[in-house]
Curated annotation (Swiss-Prot):
EC number annotated for this UniProt entry: 6.3.2.1
Pfam families reported for this sequence: Pantoate_ligase
Pathway: Cofactor biosynthesis; (R)-pantothenate biosynthesis; (R)-pantothenate from (R)-pantoate and beta-alanine: step 1/1
Catalytic residues, chain numbering: 33 (proton donor)
Protein name, UniProt field: Pantothenate synthetase
Protein family per UniProt: Belongs to the pantothenate synthetase family.
Gene of this entry: panC
UniProt keyword Nucleotide-binding, yes or no: yes
């Protein structure tokens, strides 16, 4: 396995690399990331994993500086999975100008759901993913469904900007108690970690009500928020939306997703659950 730090070197490698499946990450890899790598391996001759903590997608007061950087441990895990290349550029390599002059802005989604609480986040995501697609030139790219809004943004920019890459969504990896795997779970105290699976349980309760025919979307959302709040969560949102586009759900929609974001102590957790109605 090669660890490549420059765009020039990666492009030289890419010329003779056959088909490439790509998994972009910010490092600090866990089993959820490795599931993406395993899916990528099924789909191309070579797998490239990028590791880059992207300042542009962190808001003021977020955890950019304390976000764990664990390149050597990550590289060891990826080598064991048979990855061909780890692309680990530094900030100057990916953003040579102090200020990025041109950005990719996803207007329809950047101010909704997580975007409402993290201004500029999805502009940062869309910009860095566009840059990485141009550098890596993958045939396939794998993204986890845990970051559902991010996945929707990336699907949209891939279609609208004509990137020649197949986007492969991969199911959310979960701990045995249902908690979605996330690098931020390590910030939870022992008591918070015990409480954290409640977020997924609330999503399942909403899904169950929808499956039983409830059309009171606002009422279901409100009950989930109240339940989480009672147990000490600070809830950003619980919302029922249309799958893929994330448009507001309407009565009669058959493919739905319920999404949630909430803070437990100082840690912000997100999760979602897709629902197909008969």
């Amino acid at each position: 396995m090669q660890i490549i730090h420059t765009i020039q070197e990666l492009r030289a490698w890419r010329k003779n690399a056959g088909t490439v499946a790509f998994v972009p990450t910010m490092g600090n890899l866990h089993e959820g990331h490795l599931a993406l790598v395993r899916e990528a391996k099924k789909r191309a001759d070579n797998v490239v994993v990028s590791i880059f903590v992207n300042r542009l997608q962190f808001g003021q007061g977020e955890d950019f500086d304390k976000y764990p950087r664990t390149l050597q441990q990550d590289a060891d895990k990826l080598e064991a999975e048979g990855v061909a290349v780890v692309f680990a550029p530094d900030e100057k390599e990916l953003y040579p100008n102090v200020e990025q002059r041109y950005n990719v802005e996803p207007p329809n989604l950047q101010n909704e759901l997580c975007g409402k609480f993290r201004p500029g986040h999805f502009l940062g995501v869309a910009t860095v993913v566009s840059k990485l697609f141009n550098i890596v030139a993958p045939d396939v790219a794998c993204f986890g469904k845990k970051d559902y809004q991010q996945l929707a943004v990336i699907k949209g920019l891939t279609e609208d900007l004509n990137f020649d890459v197949e986007i492969v969504p991969v199911d959310t990896g979960r701990a045995e108690d249902g908690l979605a795997l996330s690098s931020r779970n390590q910030y939870l105290s022992a008591a918070e970690r015990d409480e954290a699976p409640r977020l997924y349980r609330e999503l399942k309760a909403v899904a169950e009500s929808l499956a039983q025919g409830s059309l009171d979307y606002a009422g279901l959302e409100k009950r989930a928020v109240q339940s989480l709040t009672e147990y000490g969560w600070v809830v950003d949102y619980v919302e029922i939306r249309r799958v893929d586009t994330l448009e507001v759900a309407r009565a009669g929609d058959k493919k739905l997703v319920v999404l949630a974001a909430a803070r437990l102590g100082t840690t912000r957790l997100i999760d979602n659950l897709e629902i197909k109605l008969p």
